[in-house]
Design a protein with these regions (language model features):
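Amphipathic alpha-helical segments typified by the pilin-like N-terminal helix
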Residues: 1-27, 34-35
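Periplasmic/extracellular, small/polar-rich flexible segments of pilin-like filament-forming proteins
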Residues: 34-125
């Protein structure tokens, strides 16, 4: 019997793709987060685009291209101990990601076409 749209373990293929893409996106967003901390340390405010972060040494890398990762964020002058949100996505779709002092968490319950997760302090447009 063939498995249609599912893996042998019964997990939907779409979930596998989301998980794989989340891993790629999260890895890059952790880099963004690290440089945001550096930028905040130097400037007492957060960068509002990747170009500002690229001005730091060592420079942050470009987002992955396979799959392509898009990152949009607005975090004006905030306390880094608080949470903020990032919209990021790949060819699977755009989702909200929540950045905290403990890392980047996927918010698969909140696609980028919807409202920001209520637990995030900032909404991005």
């Amino acid at each position: 019997m063939a498995f249609v749209g599912k893996t042998a373990g019964g997990r939907p293929l779409e979930a596998n793709r989301r998980s794989s893409n989340d891993t790629i996106v999260q890895s890059y967003l952790r880099e963004v987060q690290k440089y945001q901390e550096m930028y905040y340390g130097f400037n007492r405010r957060y960068a509002q685009n990747l170009a500002q972060l690229k001005a730091l040494v060592p420079p942050i890398e470009d987002p992955p291209t396979t799959p392509p990762v898009t990152v949009r964020f607005v975090t004006p002058g905030v306390d880094y101990n608080r949470e903020y949100c990032v919209v990021a996505g790949t060819n699977v779709g755009q989702y909200w990601y929540q950045a905290t002092s403990k890392g980047v968490r996927v918010r698969t319950d909140a696609p980028a076409t919807g409202a920001a997760p209520t637990s995030c302090d900032f909404t991005l447009y």
